[in-house]
Amino acid sequence: MAEITAQMVKELREITGLGMMECKKALTEASGDMKAAEDLLRIKSGAKASKAAGRTAAEGIVAAHIARDGKSGALVEVNCETDFVARNEDFIGFAHSLAELLTTESIGDNEALANARLSNGESVEEFRKALVMKLGENISIRRFARHQVAGAQDRLASYLHGAKIGVMVDYTGGDPALGKDLAMHIAASKPVCVSSEQVSPELLERERQIYTAQAAESGKPADIVARMVDGRIAKYLAEITLLGQPFVKNPDQTVKQLLAEKSAQVNGFTLYIVGEGIEKKSGDFAAEVMAQVGQAKQEKAS
């Protein structure tokens, strides 16, 4: 049986919001499998699914850029080791340079991006290595997405929340104000996809199994259990899909209703949350403090 560490219990508590002993027991029953332990706790406690895909742990920023003609745009997440470096002007400038580059060039993967040239003539990888040497931290380009509108009436809108959450949305109809509202809504409500048709069958089946197990414990007849499960699935889909969510600026109206009112539609979106799904090593806080102290000493000496 896998050893159940205090760090594992802490992580499961952060995901579920449940007590230490409950989490430890679930991890023991699941032989240390974090996902299986979360499912066990949800079945037993009726807890909701964790909205976040993972714990936000790594540092860095999200940068966005949209071309002047509004036809193309890009979102990129660049990671570093401490929040101190994430606020550094050179680091921020690098991230924004990448967003601009990705807007103008169709780049398919990280390898191609590493070999692409920035406006100063250096390759992205050369500039990244120089920045690592200058700032003394590992710097990585985690992910990026390029949007290219298809039709004359299509638009792009972006929103950055403290550079830690970034959104780019591709929509048709409406006006720039609608685009901004949609991007802000996505940042706040964090939908998984646009509509229920886009929810992965695997995710839906996992939720159905959990809801079925929860409902079965009620002891009610099978037909009532089936209706309970269908109702919970419908509610779940409304929570995770953009069209089903209540609009943040008017909760009495769903996003689907808002779009119908504006004769508009959402073609797709990208949502990045810095460090989502990346785990920090234990002791990172102390390391971050020491890194900041060391950086301050270097700046004072120079």
Swiss-Prot record:
InterPro entries in alphabetical order: EF-Ts_dimer_sf (IPR036402), Transl_elong_EFTs/EF1B (IPR001816), Transl_elong_EFTs/EF1B_dimer (IPR014039), Transl_elong_Ts_CS (IPR018101), UBA-like_sf (IPR009060)
Alphabetical UniProt keywords: Cytoplasm, Elongation factor, Protein biosynthesis
GO molecular function terms listed in the Swiss-Prot or TrEMBL record: translation elongation factor activity
Q: Which domain of life is it from?
A: Bacteria
Where in the cell is the protein located?
Answer: Cytoplasm
Q: What's in the GO CC field?
A: cytoplasm
Q: Which residue ranges does UniProt annotate as crossing the membrane?
A: none
Involved in Mg(2+) ion dislocation from EF-Tu: annotated segments? 82-85
> Hey, which family's this protein in?
Belongs to the EF-Ts family.
Q: What does this protein do?
A: Associates with the EF-Tu.GDP complex and induces the exchange of GDP to GTP. It remains bound to the aminoacyl-tRNA.EF-Tu.GTP complex up to the GTP hydrolysis stage on the ribosome.
Recorded protein name is: Elongation factor Ts
Q: Which source organism?
A: Nitrosospira multiformis (strain ATCC 25196 / NCIMB 11849 / C 71)
Chain's gene name: tsf
